[in-house]
Amino acid sequence: MRVSRVTPFLADLGSGKNLCFVKVETDGGPHGWGECYTQADRDTSIVALVEAIGRYLVGRDAGHITHFVHWAYHDFAAKRGAMDFWSAVSGLEQALWDIAGKRHRVPVHELLGGPCRDRVRVYANGWYGGAKTPGEYAARARDTVGRGFDALKFDPFPGPWRTHITRAAEEQAVANVAAVREAVGAEVDLLIEVHRRLAPMHAVRIAREMERFRPFLYEEPVSSSNLEALAECRRQIAIPVVTGEELYTRAEFRRVFELRAADIVNPDVCNCGGILELRAIAQMAEPSLVTVSPHNYNSTTVGLAATLHVSAAIPNFLITEYFVNFEARGREIATPPFEVKAGHIAVPVRPGLGIELDESALARFPARASTGRAMPTPGDEAP
């Protein structure tokens, strides 16, 4: 069964960035869907790479998934990967797994050794958009818990993202966390997102202030581009530290485990190299007693489906990400939609990834040329 066509779809589903889906067709067999991670205003380069790599994928056996990733990196990219490249590869790799599952009439997790669980715990993200004050964070948190979520992730810091911030910014972040904890009670897990922004001096001081609110985790307090600094931060605080969303493939995760720089890793199936690579990273983490919380700043459709299958198949899974603000549009473009019940999603049981996209629905959401973001001026910078 050989690949006959590769088609990327770029769509603006109102998520603040364009989303990139990939359809891989075969000569007389099933087709497959994948999703590539994107960032705001960094999507057309990923589409271009999908098209360029796709030209070499056409004519090849759709079942040769491991070899596809091997030659894409070693030969197409000449061993020079980056976010855009690995995002393109990840989407294509997922589509090949979707084809494999459909071909063998089993869900993808059965091809990964079978499930370790029948449902996957998720935390809500995207629920606090526009919140600036503690009261606004608290109100949005109560609403989200009212929808059935028992874990909330949020970035409590004022912008812009900077390595060194003022005491006032530190205090505002702590106040926002305090307000959310008071609003939702002690039983809801709070996941604190830092977005790689801080130097250890800030990250440690803030974490110690937040410890009394019992955060579930502290995500990327320091960039993984400086793992020694991240490890320094981890050693000084009592909140589990997460890293991984800016790392790609096993090669980049190796030193996380060697340095014991994190308690939890959060690779993203849409940019870490795909389904097999996410599982391989989880397997590396397990003997180091590190758990896995897959990042999923993707749609609630294909990217989520791929995440669910890997999450089902790895023993050291913890929790994964679900963007509540992507949910409504996701239901318009995909069938069947995933349902969150009591903070969990049932592991898909249909063949392949277990989800199909509607191309006519995607056409109703053309991509935006630019998000029109406001970039900071010198006057926006802290002293």
Where are these regions (language model features)?
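Metal- or metallocofactor-binding catalytic centers and their adjacent structured scaffolds
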Residues: 27-103
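Shared catalytic-loop signature of beta/alpha-barrel
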Residues: 44, 48-53, 67, 208, ...
